Amino acid sequence: MKRYCLIFAATTLFSFISPKTLKGTWQFAGGIYNGKKEGAPEGYALQRKYTARHYQAFVIEKGAKPEKYEAGDYALNGDSCIDTETFCSQPSKIANIPIPYLYTLRNDTLTLKGTLPTGMQVQEYWIRIR
């Protein structure tokens, strides 16, 4: 009986431990921007490849070479993900500005929710593909 209680307690505790990284490849599945719901783009995909502390974002079009459009650093702290864009292929108002997001992981879905420095409220959904 003690053994079962110990196993139950350990399982319960481990279920509350957050991952230390987002390592892997994630594909954009849609989001909510200032209250307006938007689906994933059609005809191409947006993917982020996370390492232990950095990420690179790509536009993936069938038959074309992936095009990097963004890169940056991130850090996980509790339920927060601090994202700092260090490269953008387009002019950006958020370059080198740390942006805190509330993040959640459920199964293979990453949700990032926060407010950009421009005031825009975002909630994005990313699906792990690798």
Residue ranges of predicted features:
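Sec-dependent N-terminal signal peptides
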Residues: Y4-L13
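Lipid interaction determinants
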Residues: L13-Y69, I82-R130
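Phosphoinositide-binding peripheral membrane targeting modules
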Residues: G72
